[in-house]
From Swiss-Prot:
The keyword Transmembrane applies. Belongs to the PsaM family. It comes from the Eukaryota. This is Photosystem I reaction center subunit XII. The chain crosses the membrane at residues 7-26. SUPFAM superfamilies: Subunit XII of photosystem I reaction centre, PsaM. NCBIfam families: PS_I_psaM. It is found in: Plastid, Chloroplast thylakoid membrane. One of its GO terms (cellular component) is photosystem I.
Amino acid sequence: MEITTNQVYIALLASLIPAFFAFKLGKSLNQ
């Protein structure tokens, strides 16, 4: 099974976006 650069990019994005929103939400809740 070949892993293309596109798939790596999509997987990275898919894991980064929720983490980013969770971080923003956590910061706004702490204020």
